[in-house]
């Protein structure tokens, strides 16, 4: 998961710093839960950010370089939506059964500033599917007017049976 800190707010053309998320005190944290349950539902983990050089990545190795520097692993990150002071994103094939996860990020009050370490942002596992009937390969997502998360499935199977799933 990445963020960009501009050199000058509102003027992206003036450059800045691309950063990757790292779980505080747990470098190279594996949120996928494929082999072991490192990420527990609703457990908030404080984050730090790793600076990434050469973000154009002509060798297509940005994620690998970030991981070597301690960035967390997420399973096929896709859809993203800003809710009410929180951000949600899909990890399409995350989870023990590899049916999908939704992560929730709560930014620091001091996000992107020198004071951020005093009150870091927090990442948590919001949803992890244990059954295809619950949730299967979430891709895009949004937050409805009543605050519930709506996730669009995106399976690649012989019989395509995708749904919109509501998460409360």
Task: Locate each region found by the language model.
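Sequence/structural signature of beta-propeller domains
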Residues: 1-168
